[in-house]
């Protein structure tokens, strides 16, 4: 690929920890506005969730804190001073001039990597009201045009194309693409259970958020 929009500039390169932090902040801003911005402890818990995260990570407060400060210096996060605890919020939407729909799609791709349009539509249900898959695709195409997302043509054995963000380290992105080149496709019978899986993940995420509130 040779287009000037194929990849973002060096200023937008993000580490895997940066990506997880931003994705978690975007998610919690949309799903748990009553506890957002997040304390450092709550953010670490969000980053290390066992559900709705691919891959699952085990970040420490030190790692998250260091990345937050680096992201703040680049205008992607902001520390909000509080009387009881300091909290963190994402500023990616303002830094990159993203509309809400684009921010949510970026957040989902940050947290779960390459996904189909239908997966993004289903998983965004708690965060943004897309009318249909065409709206999702339209916003993905706008992100691709700006070099912020990538289109992954369907591979042998796959039924649909996939989309992922383009803000990570090039080596990490190549590894993701390689790992996804021959995935085990869900069977037709298993497709019915996707919504059930998403429902269970949402319930577990809600419990983890309550735990974060108690500990934060």
Swiss-Prot record:
Domain of life assignment: Bacteria
Protein name as annotated: UPF0502 protein PFL_4004
Pfam families linked: DUF480
HAMAP family referenced in this protein's UniProt entry, alphabetically: UPF0502
Similarity remark: Belongs to the UPF0502 family.
InterPro entries assigned to the protein according to its UniProt record, in alphabetical order: DUF480, WH-like_DNA-bd_sf, WH_DNA-bd_sf
Organism: Pseudomonas fluorescens (strain ATCC BAA-477 / NRRL B-23932 / Pf-5)
